[in-house]
Amino acid sequence: MTKTTAQIAPVATLDHLVVAATTLADGIEYIAEVMGVVPQPGGKHVAMATHNALVRLSERTYLEIIAIDPAGARPSRPRWFGLDDIALQAELIERPRLIHWVARATDIARRAAACPIALGPVHVMARGDYRWRIT
């Protein structure tokens, strides 16, 4: 007997989509124009010197608008999603862009170790009181 798709637990599920912009204000304005909804304030990712705004898409999925926080201290490592990349920064001057997606998984360390491509170490991140782990 084989399991149906509904019986197989997913390894990971979509958590959120990431739209990057040169400034958070530009990203919020762009999403308001194209989606007809105004993103809500998110917060600051101090370790990455980024800040964001959010649009809820479903019960457990959202759209994140992210930009480098000009008030933040430059991080000791490259910012996530390639935000420090000069080519990406040039593209974002033209308009904000959908640049990434993020999956939610249980036991991220085990999942990352089992991945056929190197995902890098698991880091604990925070935005205000909210904490999560990411590779």
Give residue spans per PLM region.
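Active-site-proximal cofactor/substrate-binding loop regions of enzyme domains
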Residues: 2-65, 69-74
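Generic signature of intrinsically disordered, low-complexity segments enriched in small/polar residues
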Residues: 33, 65, 83-84, 133
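Vicinal oxygen chelate
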Residues: 2-3, 12-23, 43, 51-67, 74-113, ...
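Glycine-centered loop/turn motif at secondary-structure junctions
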Residues: 35-36, 80, 116
